[in-house]
Each structure stands twice: as structure tokens, then as C-alpha cells.
Amino acid sequence: MTYNIVALPGDGIGPEILNGSLSLLEIISNKYNFNYQIEHHEFGGASIDTFGEPLTEKTLNACKRADAILLGAIGGPKWTDPNNRPEQGLLKLRKSLNLFANIRPTTVVKGASSLSPLKEERVEGTDLVIVRELTSGIYFGEPRHFNNHEALDSLTYTREEIERIVHVAFKLAASRRGKLTSVDKENVLASSKLWRKVVNEVSQLYPEVTVNHLLVDACSMHLITNPKQFDVIVCENLFGDILSDEASVIPGSLGLSPSASFSNDGPRLYEPIHGSAPDIAGKNVANPFGMILSLAMCLRESLNQPDAADELEQHIYNMIEHGQTTADLGGKLNTTDIFEILSQKLNH
């Protein structure tokens, strides 16, 4: 079997971190004996510059045919038209591929707890995943309107939309430490009342998973005061957007965090959580670990290569533990150095 991968380098530092990661993929495929082919497509601001829109039909169709999609980063101050922004291409891609589940791991690597803005003893051993519903909720709700006197947004969830994201979270929790925290605002929101009801019903199908409920404001506090207590957190779109960004600073750098977006049966999208960082683009100083860890997620989830994913992650964790990092993590290496060291480790 030959896996079909679509590469979307995007904007800013996206091309350099993605292209370097693809060089690692070539080494890994030879080592673990699997085949793949890459289709490169412009996306985001780069696509606006070339084609006048952030996501062309050609690119979208290629993504629909793919086994996996790897995205570098998009956006930047260059693209200011509110009706034609790079981010609109990503929203359209998620919706078109029905990428309803966003998976965001947060791991504090051994030896790197000093990088966290929190006390070391508070974050050591943190290993959690936030499962965020991605295609419904207040970001997509209708009706919505805005004028100088009034603005309206609509927060709507159906039972089916809640059930499918909750099943993803339960299955993930069952494969990890067996603990699921469901986040809502059940004390004031009707949508959260339905959310909690559905979570309790679905929990009957997963007796091996312990479930607890937290209001979103309480969860935001516990993420700071005791992040180690969490295993898997599941939440609706807006809450997940906020909480996953909060959790991402716990390890000390946005550059350490990967993410994946899943549908039930279509291609999955893998990308680092950081932005395009146009101020450092082309300077060979970008931290590529988030992109490489996203590649590891792709190896495990879409390319059926769990051993390769484990090896790649362990090499990264060992590098971080021994201070072999870029400047944002306190090290002295540049982007190329990171890829060269990992290439040597993988070839060993």
C-alpha cells in the first residue's frame, strides 16, 4: 500500500518546518519499510497570493483524496482583507472534511519542567489531551448578526454532534489512563445541560473509564493549579479553543505542541498549534518540534506506524532533556541543526 499525503506548507515558518519534517519522513519510511507519495499544494496566504483565495477547489479535492494532511502554518499581517483571510481557508477545510474532533496533547517532558511558567513541582509529569469539538457550536451557529447597537451569536448543539465527539474522547481515555473530564457550563447554558446528559448516557458504554464533570471556569483554574490530575478532557468548541491554548503554555513553549483533527472515516489533518511567526520566517531559528511531533501523530494514527511514532517522539524528548533545543527552549541550535541531529538518530 502507498499512502497519499498532502503537504500544505502555508505561510511564514510553515515551509521550513514542514519540508524538514518531510525529510525525516523519508528516512523513517525506509527504516520501517512503508511507501508514501506527497502532493504539495499552496494554502492560506500563499494561496491567496497565487490564486486569489486561501483554499482552491484543486487543493480541497486533493485533501479529500488523501490518507493524511500535513500543515505547516498559515496567516500573517500581510493578508488584511476580512473577506479573504488565510484562516478562512482552514475553517473551510475543516468543515469540508468534517474534521469535527481536534486532539491537542500537552506533555511536560522529563528534564524540561523548568521551562514552564508554573512551578516545576506543579507541572512535572503532566500528560493530558484535550479533545475539542471543532465544527459546531457558537463559531458556526446561526442566526448571527452585528450592527452598531446589537450583536448576536448562536450556540447550538445537537445530540448527534455531542455523541460523536464524546465517543472519540471515551475511546482515547480507554487507551490511556482511563479518566475523562467533561467540561461544560451546565449551571447556566441549555446546550451544556444537553452536553452533560449525553456524556452521562454514553459513559454507560465505557465502564472502564471514570468520568467527572467540571464547569469551564473551574477547569481553567485546575489546569494551572494541578494539571497533573487530568488525563483526557472533552469540551465543546469555544471552551476547547480557550482551554487548549491555556494548556499549551504549561510546557513552556507553543513550539512543543502538536495537534490533529479527525473525522470519522476521512483523512486527518496534522499541524503544530503555533502560528506562522512571520518575524522569524527564513532565519533558520524556528522551533520545529511541534511540527515533528505532529508528524509522529500522523505516523501513529494515519500511517499505521506506531513503532516509528514512538521512536521519533523518544528522540525528541531525549533532545529536550539534554538541552538540544532552539533558543525559545533555552538552547543554541537552529532549525537545520534539529533536523540534522534527528536524521542522525533515526539513521543510527
From Swiss-Prot:
Quaternary structure, from the entry: Homodimer.
Q: Where does substrate bind?
A: 94, 104, 132, 217
- Primary location group: cytoplasm
Annotated keywords: Amino-acid biosynthesis, Branched-chain amino acid biosynthesis, Cytoplasm, Leucine biosynthesis, Magnesium, Manganese, Metal-binding, NAD, Oxidoreductase
Pathway involvement of the protein, from the record: Amino-acid biosynthesis; L-leucine biosynthesis; L-leucine from 3-methyl-2-oxobutanoate: step 3/4
Cell compartment(s), UniProt: Cytoplasm
| Cofactor remark from the record | Binds 1 Mg(2+) or Mn(2+) ion per subunit.
* Descriptive protein name: 3-isopropylmalate dehydrogenase
* UniProt-recorded Gene Ontology molecular function terms: 3-isopropylmalate dehydrogenase activity; magnesium ion binding; NAD binding
- The residues the entry assigns to the signal sequence are none
Q: Which organism is it from?
A: Staphylococcus aureus (strain Mu50 / ATCC 700699)
Catalyzed reactions per annotation: (2R,3S)-3-isopropylmalate + NAD(+) = 4-methyl-2-oxopentanoate + CO2 + NADH
Q: Where are the transmembrane segments?
A: none
The cofactor(s) it depends on are: Mg(2+); Mn(2+)
Enzyme Commission number: 1.1.1.85
A GO CC term?
cytosol
Residues that bind Mg(2+), according to the entry? 217, 241, 245
UniProt lists the family membership as follows: Belongs to the isocitrate and isopropylmalate dehydrogenases family. LeuB type 1 subfamily.
Which GO terms are recorded in the biological process aspect for this UniProt protein? L-leucine biosynthetic process
For the site labelled Important for catalysis, the residues are 139, 185
Q: What does this protein do?
A: Catalyzes the oxidation of 3-carboxy-2-hydroxy-4-methylpentanoate (3-isopropylmalate) to 3-carboxy-4-methyl-2-oxopentanoate. The product decarboxylates to 4-methyl-2 oxopentanoate.
Please give one Pfam family short name: Iso_dh
Q: Where does NAD(+) bind?
A: 76-87, 275-287
PANTHER family according to UniProt: 3-ISOPROPYLMALATE DEHYDROGENASE
